Amino acid sequence: FADKPWAKRVPSIEQWRTLFRTHNGIEPPPPLICDFVYCHEEADVAADRGSRYIASYLESVLEHYEVMGDHFRDTAGYEAYANAAETLQRIGAGGFLRGFLDATAHGTPEQVLGAYRTRWELVGGFEAAPSFRFGGIPYDEAEASLRLFAAEVLPELRRWEVEGAA
């Protein structure tokens, strides 16, 4: 998931690649990166709506899973969640939202492609798994975002595939 700076994701992706090679004896496929995408022709609209809907989604996750609570601390097998909770308590929901927004691909088609290009430069080739309906986005807005992505972003991503990128 696109949920924190991509430079911080690189070690876990490299660990996955190493483990894949070790256990399968072949090169790993490109990682599948899930993302919340909001694409709009106008940068200010994309920034406003993208951040609003992503914030709505994150608020629901924080509330539903009680991610910022202390209940993971003494639960065996949930140490990673406990560590995440400590970080979230330190940076707060606002800090988490800023990091999440910075990691996601939302904006104009050019901005979305720029976000994907930055990822490619850090992690290498990947498969994109965008989600267009989240955080209460009305269906018509989600469809418009998806169609714009399909018309202007996807053809470029397909060229990257031919070139060995995404």
Question: Over which residues does each language-model region extend?
Answer:
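Glycine- and other small-residue-rich loops at beta-strand/loop junctions that grip anionic moieties
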Residues: 1-2, 35
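Glycine-rich, proline-tolerant flexible connector loops at the mouths of alpha/beta enzymes
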Residues: 3-6, 130-142
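An alpha-helical appendage that flanks or caps ligand/catalytic pockets
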Residues: 7-125, 158-166
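C-terminal helical cap(s) of enzyme catalytic domains, especially alpha/beta-barrels
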Residues: 11-16, 138-158
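Short, charged/polar low-complexity linear motifs in solvent-exposed/disordered segments
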Residues: 65-67, 131-132, 147
